[in-house]
Structures are given as structure tokens and as C-alpha cells.
């Protein structure tokens, strides 16, 4: 049974192929974090359209309020314009490479039935989330706040699959490829790698379910890689090939793209891919998002009002969320919500004082269990990554 029906495939093609054939990526004019242009992909609710071809759509702020982000509103991110129509009956996951002792091929049924099941809640965040808020502007998809979501991912542990294939002692990296392709032969295939220790970590999954349902087409069906705590660039969609190798993978999307200045951010290292100048982006930084009140909201004087939002990091977990309403002179701790695990986001809330009329600026910062805290200022980088500065929202009490 096709993951994407013929009608859906035709609709998707009609919406995107014409632009892709010209080698264009059209970005809406209101792209600097604005939420004005909404469009619906087949099977999705209306999302904020950031690019037409390849499809890049972000989740509206209102849909980031629930504890789990719904499948129909989860953001969509593609690097290549030819979106695969995967047929699960014929899909196979191939595992091999020079450091694989027993190469294998698995059908979806075999993947589901041959290994212990595993589930975890985790934030999937595009590396460039909030790029559209950078000043000066930097190239790339101009995401606002919604190139992320929190979901319950279910599947099998990658390490169990790798062990079945036999991991040789010289294994250095594991390389992943998916079924999406490019229009032009010269366009580099989207292929990523992980260091062997991260690939063998018990939290790294091959998922075929999202929030208790089969993985949606636009989010990687029938199976995708889940790398909790690391940015979404490693979460390979429509997974088809896994290669275990004794050398550093030198593909474009590792050696040239998704890189940050070496030493600029306190994140996990990817030693085999580092140079003196740059290193691959890896973990997410401690961060937060205010979901209520919305920017420029008008609150009624004397009536109850609640600050609410989400906080997350790269996997140590959230220790506290602090709120300031006096120009950051003093901070109060918000109440944290349910703990879904160290890779999931954590809800927070705090009653707001609406006794006085006038403008109100609310600042929020999260603190991780490892002691990291959101900084006051953005660490500028040319790729537009890691915007985790203190979050603010300005409202009016009337």
C-alpha cells in the first residue's frame, strides 16, 4: 500500500515540480519569521510556507501549544526536490559497508519483527530554526520559531540493527541515505553520517511510528532516523541505506554544509569531521519558546492571564525556566509541567500581573540540568544556526 497515494503524489508534483525544474527555491516575501503565508500539503493542515521547492513548511505558533505536536501540523523539511513515493511492500533497508561483517537487507515487516521495540519522546528541531530572525539576514530557508516539534517516536534501536549486521572493530562512522533525490545530476545527494558512538547510543532509533500512528509521508515514511538531542539534519527521512565504514564520510552535506565555527558553541564534538576552522553542528542548545501570550497580544487589566511555553535542550533535561517582567532586573521561576524525558520539551507556566495598564515585556530563559542557560545575545554565524538567546514577547495591558 503506498505511503503516498497516486492522487497525493500528483497534487504534490503539481505544486512543486515546475519550480524545481528551473532550479529555483521560492521563499515567501514574509519570510523573516512572519506567519502570514499558509498552505496545505496533502495530509497536512495549513502550515507556514517557507519554500515551495523543495517543500519547507513550518508549524504555526498555535500548533506548538500541545505537549505533543500533532502529525498533521508537524513541520516539513526537505533538501532535495524529488519527493519519493515509497511503497511499503517493496521497501527495503540495506545495511552494509566495509565495516559491516554481515550485510543485510530488511523489509519493513522484518524491521518491526526482528528487533525489540523502543519508544521515546524527543524534540526534532531543524538546525536553522529561527534563521529568519537573524540580523543581518543570512542565506537559507528563513524559518521563524516553528521548524520544530515534540513527538513520541517508536521503532527499533539503531544499534540492534547495526549489531545484526556486525560492526567491525575499525568502524568510525555510520552513513545514512534516504529515498529523496534531486532534479539535476550535479546536485549532491542528501547523505549524512554519525560518529560510531552516537550511532550505537541506545537512544538513537529507526522509527516507523510518530505519536502512535504510522510515520506520515512528509515526515519520512516508512522509516526515518531519530537522533535525540541532535539537530534535525541527522534525522534522515525515507531511510533506505546504512553504511558502516572505517573512514570519515566526505559528502557535501558533511564536509561543506551544516557546519559552525570550531569552538563557538558548547556542544558534543564530531571529531572525525572536525577541521581547525569548522565542525559539524551536533546537539541542540538550551532554548525556550513563549507560546502564550502571543506577540502584541492585548491583555485586559485586572483579568487573569497566564504565561506559557516550552523549554528544551540537547539531552540533559530542563532544570528551571526563569521569567522577568522588569527589564531583566529580577527573575522568577516558572512552574514546570510534566517531564516526558530528557530529550522532550518541558512545558512551563506562570501567572502574569495585569493590575497595571501599559506595555509589558516578558523575558524567558531556560536552564539545563548541566548548568547551561540561555544567553542574552545571539552568537552570530553565517549559516544561521543556534539562535537560543533569551526569548521575549511584548504585550499591552489595557
Regions found by a protein language model. Name each.
Residues 117-147:
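Short, conserved helix/loop micro-motifs enriched in His/Cys and acidic residues
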Residues 97-99, 110, 128-130, 180:
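A mature extracytoplasmic/lumenal domain signature
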Residues 148-154:
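Mid-length scaffold segments of soluble, non-membrane domains
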Residues 91, 107, 122, 154-157, ...:
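Stable alpha-helical elements in mature extracytoplasmic
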Residues 3-93, 99-102, 115-116, 163-398:
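Extended, aromatic/histidine-rich regions of cofactor-dependent oxidoreductases associated
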Residues 95, 126, 158, 364:
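Hydrophobic/aromatic pocket-lining and membrane-interface residues
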Residues 106-116:
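Short Gly/aromatic-enriched secondary-structure transition segments
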